[in-house]
């Protein structure tokens, strides 16, 4: 004699989030207010016999099961549980407003630096000495750094005499469109960019009387050096 198994698709209820002291009797007691109950069981661990925190309740009819599932998060034995039809699966418990909070995601580049301070900028070697790292400047000082000329002043040129600077400036006017200096040998310049050199005398434009006077003064300052033609006589 074969018995037909009853369809429990719409009558079997999954109950999750149960406290560990909930028993079959206490689970049945809670759901019996919604209608007739065919079965109420708390799933336990086979080895320890303790509750695993969930169970199943089978109601006698579909209407009773719908009434039992009307509240998806009832309080059972002092703890908020989650109730749903078993064929739909477990339904997560709804968090109360104020408990859930979001954390703003930060860029990986900002996490490594406190307060999002911008990183130091390394300028191309065509503008400054290789290896020099210039820190980020404030917006108020950004206007001063927009000029294409970088003024190398201070102690960097203290070891050079006034006569040497004047001679270098006078010789540079014959071949280059910008002033050159022995101190600038370690610096590389690109087309259209130059650097200003502090000079003890006022440089004049090429081709003027002032430029000729400056060149004569520089030649007089270096009178101890032999003219370039002596080098040619030595080779002969």
From Swiss-Prot:
Domain notes: The RRM domain is necessary for mRNA stability and mRNA translation regulation.
SUPFAM superfamilies: RNA-binding domain, RBD (SSF54928)
Tissue: Expressed in fetal and adult heart and skeletal muscles.
Protein induction: By p53/TP53 following DNA damage (at protein level). Up-regulated during embryonic stem cell (ESC) differentiation into cardiomyocytes.
GO terms, molecular function: mRNA 3'-UTR AU-rich region binding; mRNA 3'-UTR binding; mRNA CDS binding; pre-mRNA intronic binding; sequence-specific mRNA binding
Subunit structure: Interacts with EIF4E; this interaction prevents EIF4E from binding to p53/TP53 mRNA and inhibits the assembly of translation initiation complex. (Microbial infection) Interacts with HCV mature core protein; this interaction, which enhances the interaction of Core with 5'-UTR may favor viral replication over translation.
Role, per record: Multifunctional RNA-binding protein involved in the regulation of pre-mRNA splicing, mRNA stability and mRNA translation important for cell fate decision and differentiation. Plays a major role in pre-mRNA alternative splicing regulation. Mediates preferentially muscle-specific exon inclusion in numerous mRNAs important for striated cardiac and skeletal muscle cell differentiation. Binds to intronic splicing enhancer (ISE) composed of stretches of GU-rich motifs localized in flanking intron of exon that will be included by alternative splicing.
Organism annotation: Homo sapiens (Human)
Protein name (Swiss-Prot/TrEMBL): RNA-binding protein 24
């Amino acid at each position: 004699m074969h018995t037909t198994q009853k369809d429990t698709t719409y009558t079997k209820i999954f109950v999750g989030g149960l406290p560990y002291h909930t028993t079959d009797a206490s689970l049945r007691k809670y759901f019996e207010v919604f209608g007739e109950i065919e079965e109420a069981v708390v799933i336990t661990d086979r080895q320890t016999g303790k509750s695993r925190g969930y169970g199943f309740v089978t109601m006698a009819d579909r209407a009773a099961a719908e009434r039992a599932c009307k509240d998806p998060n009832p309080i059972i034995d002092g703890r908020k549980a989650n109730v749903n039809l078993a064929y739909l699966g477990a339904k997560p418990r709804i968090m109360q407003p104020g408990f859930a909070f979001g954390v703003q995601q930060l860029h990986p580049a900002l996490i490594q630096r406190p307060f999002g301070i911008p990183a130091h900028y390394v300028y191309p070697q065509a503008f400054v000495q290789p290896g020099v790292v210039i820190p980020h400047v404030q917006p108020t000082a950004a206007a001063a750094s927009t000029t294409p000329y970088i003024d190398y002043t201070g102690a960097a040129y203290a070891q050079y005499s006034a006569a040497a600077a004047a001679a270098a400036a006078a010789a540079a006017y014959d071949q280059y469109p910008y002033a050159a200096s022995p101190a600038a040998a370690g610096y590389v310049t690109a087309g259209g960019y130059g650097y200003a050199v502090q000079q003890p005398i006022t440089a004049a434009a090429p081709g003027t009387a002032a430029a000729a006077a400056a060149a004569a003064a520089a030649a007089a300052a270096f009178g101890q050096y032999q003219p370039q033609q002596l080098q040619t006589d030595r080779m002969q």
